[in-house]
């Protein structure tokens, strides 16, 4: 089988066939570029001769046959070949055990799941994956979130997905670590420009240029892109502007480089919508807008130096500055059981005094007023009960995060007796400063689902309203954190075919919160200082009895310290609506994950790659955001134990010169292992419904064995690539996933009754196909077509149970159901879904000049 310069078509790695799919993707990409180049490697496994970085910093370079885990890799050619608009799209289509939840319904804001652990841009999502760029941790200090839009896809040279709780990757590596390496002018010389356009107002342009000097070792690389789309859903435009640059100097003994990344992005993701409304209009939205503005600066000074034939040093020093502003228009669920239509005499007088006219003197009701507003306006003027009479709420947040740090490690090749050693010892220091402010303003829902705000004494949710249910949504929090780490790894060659790895890392973290609104540490104050420390070990072994098969097994531990947002929102007596409110809190514990995995991988006759593996990850004191009611309020708590275990299988074959195909299958069992009682107002099995008061606030009981929502049990990925000539390439890939319970249905017992509760409480299984075509009319030029969701399948990858405040005609309605025996008005509850994108096509033109 022909080989590519980077990776042979045959690799013994354990990446699921999705990885294999990428391997082929890379192979076809290379072949498509020139008449005679060998096929590139796919996202599958690494070749036997290829080495991978087994730690964030360079230096721990191990042949893949010595890595005791199902590591997956991919290159920039793999991503280009699949026409993936961003990193997360590529991973979801091409890498084994990876799925996404499009909770925000924006392509650049997904939750990325790997083996049931998540890296998400959304506060409140349990984070369990660490992400690194050139050795710098990208999980942000505030909530460990990952903003996928902040780094340009085209700057990525390669990625490595490391499974398990590998302690070498530090905090938050509970289920895995994603390590990204960027391009440079030595390995990526030349110039490229690309333009694209497609449906839903999609337009984009990107460029890259790089080079190096043979005389003095200087090298440089720059890439940038601009992208806009109107979005396929109502009022959902997004704009991305990204720039990455690197300059460095290579000497005979090493390299020094300085890289910079800038991002200026405006994202709109209008989230979930009630199931019935989606059936009527798949592009409809519940309320608008849901805007996120990210501005980011990233600087990284990195070096690698060979100190001798056996000893080397690598290190970096970095600085990040991220500004995030959000502006969200939401339904105020507190109004759904209130009388919000006809203003009373005092309210009419206040309206008249303020100069309003046209308000009804009598008779306003749900039947004749689809979008009520007058009682809301009057209660804002009176500062009386806008929290109950206004059906809209505008939430705004401002987050500023500065984090900086440095790391260094020594790598030594040594021999003791007959045993060879690959030793790595390192240290790291990371610090951050965070400021977070928030406010909420009352308003009313317009027919277009936007929120109109009103000026007046009661305009803001500051707790001053004359209402027993008044709440204060203001937050003014500052936080500082410091983490110091020491780590060590030793890979021992017990025999030429057997390698044992021992590793460990010690982390010490301090988090200090300062509350500007309620200082002093008393009741309701966010002030506090929290310290967490832990040593996490790892052990693994590989045995390669022949070049065609490798056995591996291992066990490791990772941990995660609670962040400022979790430490400030942990009191069940004062739930938060993330990111709307914080409260004084009881202490939280670190999350500790222990992972066991074993498997084998191999190749047959240079034409077949395969892998099979099993894994189990047990979380102790898992940090979960527990919903308190249907409107999104809740709190963080340590949740006893959870477990993710599963099977991974992959296959990649090349049956003929022009054909490559394969796939991977992931079977995941993600469950709660501890009994717990949590809020479950949207769930038909809640305690209130059991007591004869459906549609009102209640709790649900989670039992050991109940499945964690939004993590499909079965995921199958298949691909086939056809390259009839050097000028043409056609690729087809498919992702199929089983249905899952939605959030709020943690006990799996929600069932519709058609009146108080609607929707199934689950997502349905689905299969989505994607088609790509490349044509190279002449050297350097490429025209491409990409169609996603080829058969226009309606599907959802995310959902939750929540209040349904709209009729089948799209009108807002309060007190939609008659009062119960207790005099309380039930609120209809439904299943809300974040709809998947419909069939979308775009075309592009790329020109590449590699120079001499």
Language-model region placement:
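Face-selective signature of the C-terminal outer-membrane beta-barrel domain
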Residues: 255, 296-327, 331-516, 611-614, ...
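A beta-strand signature from Gram-negative outer-membrane beta-barrel systems
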Residues: 94, 138-140, 149-194
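Transmembrane beta-barrel wall of Gram-negative outer-membrane proteins
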Residues: 192, 197-228, 232-270, 289-312, ...
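Periplasmic plug
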Residues: 104, 110-163
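C-terminal beta-signal and adjacent terminal beta-strands/loops
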Residues: 2, 559, 736-748, 774-852
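Structural signature of Gram-negative outer-membrane beta-barrels, strongest in the C-terminal barrel
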Residues: 401, 413, 420-432, 475-618, ...
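Membrane-embedded beta-barrel scaffold of Gram-negative outer-membrane proteins
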Residues: 306, 312-318, 322-328, 544, ...
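Gram-negative outer-membrane beta-barrel transporters
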Residues: 407, 411-412, 495-496, 500, ...
